[in-house]
């Protein structure tokens, strides 16, 4: 569902008609009082994309350092608009040569270009918004994320037709806000090496429910989280491949930090308030810690052994990092001083998980004293105070099952989880399951194209 906010310039035509009738009036020396004509806004002219010579008047500009997605969107726009008009439109990056002047150039700006008009249009945009705006000789098409930029392009093309001479209405300034539902999740799509964010409120996993995506450089994307950084704002964390972990801005998708020095087969990643990132690796059997003051960090600042390490999660209340290994749940204090990371296990918090092969560690939203822990045979809620692994929690009849790779709950008590179907790999699935708080059985939500390993409630809160 879309809510359209249209900001349309008023077009006012004011005509003054003066008439005389009857006998001429007496001649007088007095100068009659007159009322000044009201000032009016100039009538904005329709924007012609094609010049009188039949050639394209505008060129398409894409960000030189934009994502592959936006680059392809700009190329697709060139193709579509050229086919629509029968006129060839050129395309180039926003890179400006020395002494090159672009202020007066007629340009269609796609995505977050370096032009000031793009920057102004992006102010205040969220991941759910996009803008189509005519400013002078620039047409700005930009979204709060790549998906929204794509939607903006589709709307822009729908405004053009042969009936109106392929003109854009003068003064066009449209902002669209796409309303989202209550159930936003992240999925690690191993079939395409994509981190994908979906709104599953309507029970769909398709293009209409896709909110955001980010292409990972390697195979087997495993774990992800949304966090808020004081320095960077909202960031997406992800791990994949043999030893790769990264932090990207959300939703801009700018790579802020990465490492290729995690232990083998990374499964989980966490950003702590002090800026340290922890990565748990299963095959490597370690949790490694990295500083993030530089964009690339290929030397771990600290590491601790943990057999079949699968999950890490920061606990704001207790000031510790929880971690799970094969049958172990434990916690660590993580200090950063003068660039040095010190990790100390809180042995009094260590507990033995009652079943083998732990898979996932997640917060129980609504209960800061509980954690979700999944294994090869059970789904537990761990009580931090009593150090007990409970299976008598709400909806355990549906949720406590074998081989769940990822689980989480929403504020209203609904839960989402995933377990393998083996269609792509033995640990992936095309479907996720949403247990709504008013239902006794989980909805099956299937993708026609994705093959997912982990599902994560897309929420920046640690607890």
Identify what each model region corresponds to.
Residues 201-222, 254-262, 298-302, 344-351, ...:
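Aromatic (tryptophan-biased) beta-strands that constitute blades/sheets of beta-rich domains
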Residues 185-191, 237-242, 278-283, 321-327, ...:
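Conserved beta-strand positions in repeat-built beta-propeller and related beta-rich domains
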Residues 208-270:
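Blade-loop segments of beta-propeller domains
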Residues 15-35:
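Sec-dependent signal peptide cleavage junction
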Residues 217-229, 263-272, 306-314, 353-366, ...:
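Repeated scaffold domains used in trafficking and secretory/extracellular systems
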Residues 199-205, 291-296, 333-342, 383-393:
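Short loop/turn segments immediately following beta-strands, especially the blade-tip
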Residues 32, 36-180:
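Solvent-exposed alpha-helical segments and adjacent loops
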Residues 181-183, 232-235, 274-276, 317-319, ...:
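Short coil/turn segments that connect the beta-strands within blades of beta-propeller domains
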């Amino acid at each position: 569902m879309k809510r359209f906010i249209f900001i349309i310039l008023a077009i006012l035509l004011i005509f003054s008609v003066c008439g005389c009738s009857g006998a001429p009036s007496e001649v007088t020396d007095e100068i009659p009082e007159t009322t000044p004509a009201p000032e009016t806004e100039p009538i904005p002219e329709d924007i012609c994309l094609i010049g009188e010579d039949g050639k394209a008047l505008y060129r398409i500009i894409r960000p030189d350092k934009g994502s592959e997605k936006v680059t392809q969107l700009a190329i697709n726009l060139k193709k579509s608009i050229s086919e629509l008009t029968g006129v060839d439109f050129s395309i180039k990056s926003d890179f400006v040569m020395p002494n090159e002047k672009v202020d007066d150039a007629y340009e269609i700006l796609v995505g977050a270009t370096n032009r000031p008009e793009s920057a102004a249009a992006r102010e205040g945009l969220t991941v759910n918004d996009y803008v189509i705006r005519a400013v002078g000789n620039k047409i700005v098409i930009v979204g709060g994320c790549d998906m929204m930029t794509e939607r903006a392009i589709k709307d822009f093309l729908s405004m053009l037709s042969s009936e109106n001479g392929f003109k854009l209405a003068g003064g066009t300034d449209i902002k669209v806000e796409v309303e989202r539902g209550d159930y936003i999740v992240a999925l690690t799509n191993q079939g395409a090496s994509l981190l994908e964010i979906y709104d599953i409120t309507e029970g769909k996993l398709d293009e209409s429910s896709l909110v955001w995506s980010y292409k990972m450089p390697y195979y087997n994307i495993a774990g992800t989280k949304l966090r808020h950084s004081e320095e960077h704002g909202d960031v997406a964390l992800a791990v994949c491949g043999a030893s790769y972990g990264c932090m990207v801005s959300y939703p801009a998708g700018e790579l802020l930090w990465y490492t290729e020095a995690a232990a083998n087969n990374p499964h989980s990643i966490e950003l702590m308030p002090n800026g340290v990132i922890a990565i748990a690796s299963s095959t490597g059997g370690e949790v490694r810690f990295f500083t993030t003051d530089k964009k690339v960090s290929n030397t771990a600042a600290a590491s601790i052994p943990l057999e079949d390490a699968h999950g890490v999660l920061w606990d704001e209340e207790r000031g510790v990092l929880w971690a799970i290994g094969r049958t172990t749940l434990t916690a660590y204090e993580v200090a950063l001083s003068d660039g040095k990371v010190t990790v100390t296990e809180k042995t009094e918090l260590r507990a033995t998980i009652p079943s083998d092969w732990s898979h996932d560690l997640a917060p129980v939203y609504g209960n800061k004293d509980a954690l979700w822990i999944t294994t090869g045979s059970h789904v537990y809620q761990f009580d931090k105070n009593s150090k007990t692994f409970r299976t008598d929690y709400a909806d355990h009849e549906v949720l406590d099952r074998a081989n769940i790779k990822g689980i989480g709950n929403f504020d209203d008590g609904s839960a989402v989880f995933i377990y393998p179907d083996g269609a792509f790999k033995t640990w992936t699935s095309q479907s996720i399951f949403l247990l709504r708080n008013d239902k006794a059985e989980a909805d099956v939500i299937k993708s026609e194209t994705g093959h997912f390993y982990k599902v994560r409630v897309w929420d920046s809160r640690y607890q």
